[in-house]
Amino acid sequence: AGNKPSLHSDLLLYQASTGELLSFMDADWITQMRTGAVAALAIHTLQSSTASTYAFVGLGSTAIATMQCLLAILPTDKPITCKLLRYKQQAEQFAQLFAEHTNLDFIVVDDHEDLVRDSDVIVSAVTEMPSLFCENNDLYKEGVLLVPIHTRGFQNCDLFFDRIIADDKAHVSGFKYFNQFKSFNELSEVLLNRIPARLSDTERIIAYNIGLGLHDIYFAHHIYERLTR
């Protein structure tokens, strides 16, 4: 629990020029780390300039990978309040895992509204969300960045958040309210400096940035190259 992937991944790596099978890989680590990496990239790119309170729900392997990647790119002396939703012993285990980072102040909360309230960045990595995570839209503060890694439970936010960003339009074009998004762009447009990451620190932004198959291949290629040198 907490560090065992809920989904198992295997990967076949081929040489594109010849069709030769190079490797059959257990891709659990690749899946969780590339997902964590793209989520951390979205946070680093799209968060408000004053973000200091980060909320996490769903504290399994994907959330752990996201925190690991986020800590690798945020300033090590930046004070961070990290709010965790209590579930079994996962919140306490998550906090213990990152206890060596003295700039982190962990707070465990007991309900969804407390997690959302006053959070600058909200990361959801739950695998199931049968209903809306937080129906009170007023609790999503101005400037909040919402990162639903597994996409579920935030349909109400699709309707009133100022901007929706995704790594691939195809990932979200089938969403119920896609045609009612106030504004939509792909993250690549931001990374290529075609559009600004934020128009203001009061914009509410959702980042459906969950990773592409190309990221899996990129990771697998570098792992294969290192093992076969």
Predicted regions span which residues?
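Rossmann-like adenosine-cofactor binding region
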Residues: 104-179
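NAD(P)-binding Rossmann-fold cofactor-contacting core
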Residues: 73-98
